[in-house]
Regions:
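Boundary at the C-terminal end of the N-terminal hydrophobic targeting segment
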Residues: 23-32
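Bacterial N-terminal signal peptides
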Residues: 9-20
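Positively charged n-region of N-terminal signal peptides that target proteins for export
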Residues: 1-4
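N-terminal targeting signals for Sec/Tat export/insertion, comprising classic cleavable signal peptides
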Residues: 36-60
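Compact alpha-helical subdomains of small soluble proteins
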Residues: 52, 56-128
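Residue-level detector of functional hotspots within protein domains
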Residues: 31, 37-39, 87-89
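Aromatic-acidic/polar surface patches that form glycan- and anion
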Residues: 6, 34
Length: 128
């Protein structure tokens, strides 16, 4: 009898969790159109050949910066609803030190990643 009660409660909990999971997941992630913009921004970072990315005093190649941004986006998925959220909450500054991420181009120019990504967002929004 006790085992039956435990199993009943267990399966009721699973059923309840399964019922709320889809709505929870959809409420947590960005809409498809915004995800498309974020993916386009990340692609722009990856396409910056010969550029260097600076984060907390360390230098990274574009491919490494892309992997980092994807991981940080995934970790902060619940907070990122728009491409602008991605720029502001993920791709602009270190959550640890607060220091801005920087991009140094081949010609030596340096820009904050936030400025670069906002400019890129203005270019891609009309296309998407």
């Amino acid at each position: 009898m006790k085992r039956r009660l435990v199993l009943t409660v267990f399966f009721a909990c699973i059923a309840m969790f399964a019922a709320i999971l889809p709505s929870f997941a959809s409420a947590q992630s960005a809409p498809a159109a915004e995800k498309q913009k974020i993916e386009a921004l990340i692609k722009q970072v990856g396409d910056l050949k010969h550029a260097k990315f600076f984060r907390n005093g360390w230098t990274y190649e574009p491919a490494t910066a892309v992997r980092f941004l994807r991981g940080k986006w995934e970790a902060n998925d619940a907070e990122v609803k728009t491409a602008r959220d991605f720029i502001d909450k993920v791709a602009s500054a270190s959550g640890t030190s607060g220091k801005p991420y920087l991009i140094r181009f081949k010609d030596g120019r340096e820009i904050k990643s936030q400025e670069f990504l906002l400019a890129e967002l203005k270019k891609i929004e009309p296309k998407l």
